[in-house]
């Protein structure tokens, strides 16, 4: 997102992360003692710390026109993961997926500036992360889990792509990730279970790459092999 390039002068980080940071400092978590003083300082993390990160995994914008009314409809979708992991060895403990959608209407065709202005306004004024602590409190976050569940494989038949826009066939991994994220978010919400994130070609020892707003370093977050594997 171009919005992560827009730096807030007070915090020194992008505007989306700034909103998240302000929310994190006001969170009321039932079973987690959140250190709100050192949220961005890795050097202050004790060796046995469980770290929490909110990750923007994917975002997209789609548009269609109603030829009868000449009105353009737009949808901005953002897909996130709330990750809990052992900071000492960067191994995943739990993941909670969530997403949201912004719907737009316009008499003019959307361009990049219009979309960015609407998305920026949404992040700044509509408080998309306001219920983040309520979502986390639905789960019993533990350092270890006896059993884990996750999507390990997604198969899309060629005839399905024939019904999609041509460019989708060139982005099969993106489509698979969207399907996995959408399914995992609903599964997680309905059953209050944390999910092992989907990674294309999931295998034992697989890792998810993370880059934090306060560092240029890229971390490999080790993922557990799900005991209960979902094949879509």
Question: At which residue positions do the language-model features occur?
Answer:
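Charged/polar interaction segments and conserved charged motifs
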Residues: 1-31, 81-83, 94, 106-108, ...
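Low-complexity, intrinsically disordered or weakly predicted helical/coil tracts enriched
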Residues: 56, 64-73, 86, 91, ...
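Sequence-level detector for tyrosine residue identity
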Residues: 75-79, 85, 110, 123, ...
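Elongated alpha-helical scaffolds
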Residues: 47-62, 71-84
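N-terminal segment of the mature soluble domain
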Residues: 1-55, 162-232
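C-terminal/domain-edge helix-coil "capping" segments
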Residues: 87-163, 171, 175-185, 191
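Amphipathic beta-strand/beta-sheet edge segments enriched in Tyr/Trp
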Residues: 67-106, 229-232
């Amino acid at each position: 997102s171009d919005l992560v390039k827009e730096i807030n002068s007070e915090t020194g980080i992008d505007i989306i992360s700034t909103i998240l940071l302000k929310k994190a400092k006001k969170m009321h978590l039932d079973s987690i003692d959140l250190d709100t003083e050192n949220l961005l300082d890795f050097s202050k993390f004790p060796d046995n710390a469980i770290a929490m990160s909110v990750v923007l995994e994917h975002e997209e914008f789609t548009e269609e026109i109603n030829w009868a009314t000449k009105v353009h409809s737009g949808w901005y979708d953002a897909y996130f993961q709330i990750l809990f992991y052992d900071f000492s060895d960067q191994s995943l403990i739990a993941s909670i997926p969530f997403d949201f959608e912004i719907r737009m209407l316009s008499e003019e065709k959307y361009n990049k500036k219009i979309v960015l202005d609407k998305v920026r306004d949404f992040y700044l004024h509509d408080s998309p992360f306001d219920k983040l602590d309520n979502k986390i409190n639905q789960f019993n976050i533990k350092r270890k889990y006896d059993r884990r569940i996750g999507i390990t494989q997604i198969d899309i038949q060629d005839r399905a792509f024939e019904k999609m826009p041509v460019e989708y066939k060139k982005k099969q991994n993106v489509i698979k990730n969207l399907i996995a994220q959408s399914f995992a978010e609903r599964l997680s919400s309905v059953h209050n279970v944390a999910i092992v994130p989907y990674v294309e070609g999931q295998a034992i020892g697989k890792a998810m790459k993370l880059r934090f707003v306060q560092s240029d370093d890229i971390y490999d977050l080790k993922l557990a092999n799900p005991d209960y594997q979902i094949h879509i």
